[in-house]
Amino acid sequence: NATADVEATSRCFLELLRKGQLHPAVLEGKSEQLRMLQEAQTITIKGIGLKHVNLKKASQKLVQKQESESTKPISTSLSAKLDAAPFVHLHNHSQFSVLQATSKMSQMVSVAAENQMPAIAITDHANLMGAFHFIKAVGNHNKDAVEEAQIKPIVGCEFYVCEDHKDKTRRDDGYQVVFLAKNKKGYHNLAKMSSIAYVDGFYYVPRIDRQVVAMYKDDLIVLTGNLYGEVPSKILNLGNRQAEEALQWWHGMFGADFYVELMRHGQEDEKRANEVLISLAKQYEIPLIATNNTYYATKEEANAHDILLCLKEGEKQATPIGRGRGFRYGFPNQEYYIKSSEEMKILFKDLPEAVLNIEALIDKIEPFKLAREVLLPKFGIPEAYLVPNDPDGKLGENNFLRYLTYEGAKKRYATLTDEITERIDFELSVIAKTGYPGYFLIVQDLIAAAREMDVSVGPGRGSAAGSVVAYCLKITNIDPIEYNLLFERFLNPDRVSMPDIDIDFDDEGRAKVMDYVIDKYGSNQVAQIITYGTMAAKSSIRDTARVLDLALNEADRISKLLPNIKLSKIFGLPEKDLKKALRTDEFIKVKEFMALAEESSLSGETIQQAIVLEGSLRNTGTHACGVIITPDDITKFVPVATAKDSD
């Protein structure tokens, strides 16, 4: 309340002046004015009689009044429709919104199943890192569920849409807009946009722009998003005309696949934005969709989620939420969880169409799988070994592999005995049957190139040492016949699976090999594998303790009570099973740890919140040596991002 602030500040200043309590430099040369003030004002400076209004409370009363006026009883038939209609959460963030959400895939699926929801969506911030895990989690549920309880997985993404994603001269985080894939093609368009956001558009956050949206808009559904979406944000910050222009662009771009998203988390700004959004939706005949912007699975996890946000910002939880110096980022309330169908229907009982429209939206979604057969890059073979009418090139690859193997065998063995040729032919037949001749050609080429560059290559590790073909190709340097090593442990004709050859390069040479792979196959077909750093038991204790401002020595004492076991097991296993899994001294410490968790002290609170946060994603990185090579542009298959230390 600016009026109250000005009056209070003025009174304080005049009172200090009257008492001569200001700094001498301020009072210098003003003795006469000070004397006159003190003579005229002999008592404490009083207020001037302003009637101060608590604007926050007044605003809340106004909102409540408006809500009560707008809430009209709906007809019996419409009420029955609403009761029978399915509700589906279409705006959800998982742990893969790193340090922003705590929801695990299993939790999301469980909540959907408990509420008989026919579908559920994942819409992490700008990335699709969790898409495979999400579809797998839903698939695991569906395997054991009856047909009526099947859940449809909806893969989506909440993108930051800015003015120009390549402009890095000024910060522009853009607007947060939700995209949902209608089918597999839509998923690939999401993957393309996510790759562009990270590779070309990363500046503070991964960004795309309208040009990118227009290029990859096919088979996608768009929701207007939260208060940071383009249309709601312009309603609140620029004006209704600008918001309407934005809505016209999105509606023109996506037509019947564009929906106006309404949220009710109990915020005043939502009420203001929703009134205009509803009006615009009616004007342009755009369907309304009710959502809850979820970041944690249950309301009880709200505090743990707030601790996670503090970790991200490097703040203490005791710091008040707000903007500016002395404040920290945090959510305004505890309503950002995966609410039940009943809760959502009550929230939108005055706007039943916002719930009823969901069914038509999810009917547009075609489920798809991301698990697929292994894709290998095309390995160029000499024309002499090619076979006509060989569309996938496997026959030619088998021919060339046989040639290289026998050429190598002549150098490896003084005499090619029947035993050796039988073993080679057997292995080549299994390789041909499994369909992976190209894999051996790629690996032998890679190792040959490494040796030419004087890179140290290991002699062979793991089950690949049991392959005579690998030995003849100089992939390994251990003769499996001499040491009676079994090929079947490496590649079994009765259980077809991808061969796995572990290759060791020296640390300095690894970069040379990587450069060779990029030069041979192209930078757009080669990528390193992303890794995820999660909060383990002890690190979740220490991180939580730091945010809650628990004494460092107490945090160390608690973490030292933990053996190498997950918190979820400590509090999830029956005591007899836990006792079997631990040594006697470890079990005694764990019992002390569990007793501490029951306390209402700060130590107990730390443990309870750490249990929720355990397993949360802490950071991303790159695998030390894992590399993916694809047969075409890698972004046609999976989304990519740029590593922090990459150029």
How would you label these PLM feature ranges?
Residues 1-43:
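Acidic, Mg2+-coordinating catalytic module of metal-dependent nucleases/exonucleases
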Residues 27-87, 142-148:
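Acidic, low-complexity intrinsically disordered tails
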